[in-house]
Amino acid sequence: MSRIGNKVITLPAGVEVSQEGTVVTVKGPKGTLSREIASQISMSVEGTEVAFTRESDDNKTKALHGTTRANVANMVEGVSEGFTKTLKLVGVGYRAAKSGSKLTLSVGYSHPVDFEDREDLTVEVPDALTVKVSGISKQRVGDLAAEIRAVRSPEPYKGKGIRYEGEVVRRKEGKTGK
């Protein structure tokens, strides 16, 4: 039994869910998202509730049941509220700047690292040590935030690098002298 797959999704005001074949489309105040779902999973919309059922009880279908429900729930949340990931730059001389459609990171390399804006995401730099990535697709927001973090991920000795807000970096002790 998939406990997550059996939960119904309650639609907020202004959000519509429709299905054509295996493609689910979610429309809301912030935009529209579409995703293909597995053919073994069927979706039913009744009023403001969306429910998912599976055609068999084999392990792969059970896994797809919960995953499909979670993906559609994230789409509903994205088109109604949106998603935001905040990154913090920790280190002497580390800074971020936004000029036009380009994010520039100075994080200790001999050259600045540039990121072009993605069409469906917004990147803000409220101050030189903070970068906010926001959009309607949880996956796309997380992917871009992970790409930015991978430029200089936090190191365990001094904790310098780019980290998610609230991320705890496990620190190590340095070598002890003779």
Curated annotation (Swiss-Prot):
GO MF annotation: an example: rRNA binding
Keywords for this protein: Ribonucleoprotein, Ribosomal protein, RNA-binding, rRNA-binding
Pfam family, one: Ribosomal_L6
One term under GO cellular component: cytosolic large ribosomal subunit
UniProt keyword Lyase present: no
Assembly, per entry: Part of the 50S ribosomal subunit.
PANTHER family membership: 60S/50S RIBOSOMAL PROTEIN L6/L9, LARGE RIBOSOMAL SUBUNIT PROTEIN UL6M
Protein name: Large ribosomal subunit protein uL6
Organism: Leuconostoc citreum (strain KM20)
Organismal lineage: Bacteria, Bacillati, Bacillota, Bacilli, Lactobacillales
